[in-house]
UniProtKB/Swiss-Prot annotation:
Pfam families, alphabetized: Paramyxo_PNT, Soyouz_module
Lineage of source species: Viruses, Riboviria, Orthornavirae, Negarnaviricota, Haploviricotina
Coiled-coil ranges (or none): none
Protein name: Protein W
Keyword Phosphoprotein (UniProt): yes
Biased composition annotated in UniProt, kind: Polar residues: 28-37, 77-96
GO biological process: amyloid fibril formation; response to leptomycin B
Phosphoserine found at: 257, 350
Sorted UniProt keywords: Phosphoprotein
GO cellular component: host cell nucleus
Biased composition (Acidic residues): 240-252
Encoding gene (name): P/V/C
Compositional bias (Basic and acidic residues): 296-317
Length: 448
């Protein structure tokens, strides 16, 4: 084939491409090796079998019919360049006479990059992933050196960007790849995973009461509470289950005393409380108690003071320590603090710190009578006090349930009765009513 035939073939190919630009798939400048059609391959295989069929036939005497000659072969049908016009054999290849047979033209050729281990297409230089920063090129390149890559990238594509990372850099300096990962579309602010030793549990810091109850200064009401939504999720639950050596003073008061809570009652709730349990000293109704919570001086008992709890009185007469149901981890007290809800209630004259009472356990049966139970008085002189035993149902108006994931609530929605006494939320129970004594005992046993 001379040069003139090659030029004519090139012109024919150019004319065909210009006429069929929409049907031909673009190869981005790379050569596509097209396979012959199925019809051409079938015909060539049949011709080969026919040409070689008489070659191995043997006669009865065991001698072959042909002594290895090629008379049975059809040399003209073989795929060899025999003519001078560029055709291959008698069949027309897909490189010549394009429009003769539609099977000869492969409109969607399969293009394969001649690159070893093309990770994310960083070595192609073409297409949407032409940039070497795309994909995982910095992370993946260079990790399969050795037995996998027979030919290095520098020999296959000498113009390819060198993105391999040395082994010592890969093992030691991983922080230096942050900028490269950021350009690859990853999260540059991601926190790296640091495996922790699970065999040695981390010791939690001791609980500070100010985190739960504020600073505890009940008299400091100069600061106005913030007018806005109060996120109830920020209120942490006071726990008293774990008894370590570094327990706090606030928790020790509950551990050594009867954790009973006295709530103020309004006249609408007086019907639900036994009148025998009503405590009242009319001379002290309007006084503010000058002593801290749970700490009282020694004082002789006046004859007109009534016992607020018959069980407490009987146990003290017998000389024993009164039975007490320990507080659950789901209970917490609304004592006086800098909490905006508590301060709002203190302004209204019904702050829960004045309605909460702790009893000191009697030292012996002798001085148990000389040390009566006392109650912190509130500014509301008209409201009598009532005993709220542990585990007894409370009025529904007294409870503000704290649900996990609860929405924020405005201060304007909170009434006078909200947050009085204790707020109880038990797991697995509805928050619209407090648990019974049986449920408290069962939950306490399960927690232990």
């Amino acid at each position: 084939m001379d040069k003139l035939d090659l030029v004519n073939d090139g012109l024919d190919i150019i004319d065909f491409i210009q006429k069929n630009q929409k049907e031909i798939q673009k190869t981005y400048g790379r050569s596509s090796i097209q396979q012959p059609s199925t019809k051409d391959r079938t015909r060539a295989w049949e011709d080969f079998l026919q040409s070689t069929s008489g070659e191995h036939e043997q006669a009865e005497g065991g001698m072959p019919k042909n002594d290895g000659g090629t008379e049975g072969r059809n040399v003209e049908d073989l795929s060899s360049v025999t003519s001078s016009d560029g055709t291959i054999g008698q069949r027309v290849s897909n490189t010549r006479a394009w429009a003769e047979d539609p099977d000869d033209i492969q409109l969607d050729p399969m293009v394969t990059d001649v690159v070893y281990h093309d990770h994310g297409g960083e070595c192609t230089g073409h297409g949407p992933s032409s940039s070497p920063e795309r994909g995982w090129s910095y992370h993946m390149s260079g990790t399969h050196d050795g037995n996998v890559r027979a030919v290095p990238d520098t020999k296959v594509l000498p113009n390819a960007p060198k993105t391999t990372v040395p082994e010592e850099v890969r093992e030691i300096d991983l922080i230096g790849l942050e900028d490269k990962f950021a350009s690859a579309g990853l999260n540059p602010a991601a926190v790296p995973f640091v495996p922790k030793n699970q065999s040695t549990p981390t010791e939690e810091p001791p609980v500070i009461p100010e985190y739960y109850y504020g600073s505890g200064r009940r008299g400091d009401l100069s600061k106005s509470p913030p007018r806005g939504n109060v996120n109830l999720d920020s209120i942490k639950i006071y726990t008293s289950d774990d008894e370590d050596e570094n327990q706090l003073e606030y928790e020790d008061e509950f551990a050594k005393s009867s954790s009973e809570v006295v709530i103020d009652t309004t006249p609408e709730d007086n019907d639900s409380i036994n009148q025998e349990e009503v405590v009242g000293d009319p001379s002290d109704q309007g006084l503010e108690h000058p002593f801290p919570l749970g700490k009282f001086p020694e004082k002789e008992e006046t004859p007109d003071v009534r016992r607020k709890d018959s069980l407490m009185q009987d146990s003290c007469k017998r000389g024993g320590v009164p039975k007490r149901l320990p507080m659950l981890s789901e209970e917490f007290e609304c004592s006086g603090s800098d909490d905006p809800i508590i301060q709002e209630l203190e302004r209204e004259g019904s702050h829960p710190g004045g309605s909460l009472r702790l009893r000191e356990p009697p030292q012996s049966s002798g001085n148990s009578r000389n040390q009566p139970d006392r109650q912190l008085k509130t500014g509301d002189a008209a409201s009598p006090g009532g005993v709220q035993r542990p585990g007894t149902p409370m009025p529904k108006s007294r409870i503000m349930p704290i649900k996990k994931g609860a929405q924020t609530r405005s201060l304007n929605m909170l009434g006078r009765k909200t947050c009085l006494g204790r707020r109880v939320v038990q797991p697995g129970m509805f928050a619209d009513y407090p648990p019974t004594k049986k449920a408290r005992v069962l939950l306490r046993r399960m927690s232990n």
